[in-house]
Amino acid sequence: MSAGWVAGAVRAKALVGRYPGAAGAREVAACDRLGDALRCLAATPYSRYARTAVGLPEAQRAVTATLLWHLRVLAGWLPRGGARLLVPLAAGFEIANVASRLPAPGGRRAESPQPYRLGALETAWRSLEHAATPGELRAALVASPWGDPGGDTPWALVTGMRMAAARRTAVAVPPARRWAQGRAVLLTAREQFVHQRSLLEPAQRHAARLLGGRASAAASYQEFR
């Protein structure tokens, strides 16, 4: 192992060691009031952003922004080219950026937070952020490593990106394959058995590669299980 990878491994262990872990997460979840939860976070690395949170959306954003910041820090410690392993793991932040630009249910556009700053962990955000319509977003995705989501409706764009991210994670980071498969299971089940709509072809293809053809083509929840 090169010195660069050793430095990255040491940094990763240091970051993990500072986090509250499962016990801390349960403690925060058990808080009756947001103020109590924020006080719990104040003693953790999440305080970097949580100290200015005044409501639940801001607190949630503080937690995710801290995670992204530490992924970017870790990427900076890895040797040249090593950050590519973290790009699929940061895909959710790019998806959130895209989702915030899409019309909310009913056609209205909700107030959007500032986009996450991805730095070296972006997949294609610098192209996607200039898209003014769902059709332009789809075209930008087609021309990027994300690939075609199969449609330009908000649900098609976001679901297509999420399934593509699961597939990319499984390929680029083999130890995370089970996480990626779990994500694909939840996405497939939600679309087919909650919303009663079939996955579009690109997402269906990714799901089949992750879960097998029988699961992705199941006609009932019992068969899917």
What are these regions (language model features)?
Residues 1-225:
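N-terminal domain-start signal
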